[in-house]
Amino acid sequence: MATKVMGMEKESLILGRFKKPFDIKELPKFPGYAAMIGPGIVWAGLSQGSGELIWWPYMVAKYGVFFLSWLIFYASLQYWINLEIARYTMATGEGIFEGFHRVHRIYGWAMFIMSMIVMLWVGGYVSSGATALAALTKFPAGWDAAGQTRFWAEVAIIVIWIIFILGPVAYKVVEYVEILAAFISFGGMLIAVLLSPAVAKVAGEYFPALIPWYASGFNMLPQNFDAKDMNIFITLIAYTGAGGFWNLLYSYWVRDKNAAMAAHIGRVTSPITGEPEPIPGVGVAFTASPEAHEEWKKWMTWQWIENLIGVVMNTLTIVLTTLLTYAILRPEYLATGKLPSGFKLVVYQAEWFGHLWGDVGRGILYIVGFFFLVDAYITALDGAGRTVASNLYTVPGIPERVEYRKIYYWVVTIFTVIGMITVLLEQPGVLVLLTGVTNMLIMVIFTWVFFYQNFVLLPKIHPAGKIVRPSWIVLIFLLISAIFFTYSFALYLDVTF
C-alpha cells in the first residue's frame, strides 16, 4: 500500500511495489560478439563447483549410470532461467532483485532473505577447496586434516578479500578468475579422459547412458536409493548448472558487461584503485521503434548464444568428471565403499589423475579441485555485495545518500568475516549441502514468478511494450522447468519428512 506524506506519495517498503518509472534513453548498438563474450563463461566457471566436482561423482560412484540419463535434461532447464534473468536486466539496466521488488515488495524481500541465508554458509566452498590444498601441502605440519583444511580456508578467504578490495573493477576480478577456472578445470579433465585406458574400457557403457531416460526410465530415484542421500539429490539438481541464487547473479555479470540498456549503468569499482561510476537507483528503458526492435533482436540473439556457451561448457565438464568417476572411482566404491566425505572431500577424486601420473597427477588434481570450488566463493562474495546493494537501492532516499559501491564493499567485508567464522563450525560438505537445498527452493519460486514478471509485468511497465516480451517457445520451456523443479523439490520433502 502507499500512504500520503506531506502531500507526496510515499511507497510502502513491505506491502507495495517498487514503482519508480524508468529513465528513457536510446538502446545502444550491439558492439559485436567478440566484445561481449564473458558472462556465459563466468556462469560456467561458477557452475563448475560442488555439483560437478563432488556430488555428481558421488552419485555416479554410488548408483552407477542411473542419474546420467537425467544429466542433459537437468542441465538444459537452467538455460531458460538464465535467459529470463538476462532479459530483464538487458531491457531495464536494473539488477534482477529490483525486478523482484517491482513484482511486489514482499516477494522482493523474501527472495533477499533466502539469498542471505544461502550466503551465510558460502564459506563451505572455500573449505571444500581447502581440503585439496591441505592434502597437497600437508601444512601446517603436525596438524590433522581438519586443522590443515581450516588453516588454508582462512588464508584463502583473506587473500580473496584483498584481491576484491584492490581490483579496479569488481566484475573484472570475477571474470578473470572464472574464465581461468573454467578453462583449467575443463582442460584438465579433458586431458585425463583422453589419456586414460580405464575410460576407454567403459565408454561403451557410459555414453549410451547419457541418452535421456535410457538408464532410468522416467524414475527420478533408483530402487536402491538411500534416503540419507536426499540432500545430495536435491543439491545435484540445483547445481547441474549454477542453481538458485547463483543463477540470479548472471543478471549482474550481464549488467557490468554493458549489455543493451545496462550500458547506461555504471560498474562497481574499487574504493582504492578504481574511479567511481554512477549507479542510479532506477533503471533505464528504450521506446518502441522499428530500429530499436531490430537492435533488440541482435542483443537477444547474443544472449541466446552467450547463455548456450555457458550451459554447454558446464554440461561437458560434468560429462568429463562423471566419466572419470565411472571408470576409476566406481570400481573402488564397489570394492571398498569409499566416497567423498568430511575434511577429505576432494581427496577422493585425486585418482582421476593419480591413476595416470601418480603423486604428480594427484597434486595437479588438488590444484584443479581448489580452482573448481574457491572460484565459486569468489563469485558468491561478489554476489552478496550486489544483492544487498541492489535491494537497499530500492529504498527511497538510499540511492541519493549512499554510493552503491560503498554498500558493496562493506558487505564483501562483512561476509568475509562470516566466512572465516563458518568454516570453523562445520565440515565443508554439510555447509555446501545447506546452500544446495535452499537454492533449490529459491529456484522453484522465481521460476514460477517469471511468468508474471517477464510475460506480463515487464511489457506493461516498459516503454517498448511487447518488444521485450519473451516468445511462446520460451514460455513452453520455462513451464517445463518450473514443473520439473517443483516436482523434484516436492519429492525431496516427501522422502525427507
Q: What is each of the regions a protein language model found here?
A:
Residues A146-A156, P340-V346, A350, V360, ...:
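Loop-to-transmembrane helix boundary motifs in multi-pass membrane proteins
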Residues A91, Y107-W143, A153-E154, L373-Y393, ...:
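Hydrophobic transmembrane alpha-helices that form the core helical bundles
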Residues P31, Y58-L83, E98-W109, F151-W152, ...:
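Extracellular loop-to-transmembrane helix junctions
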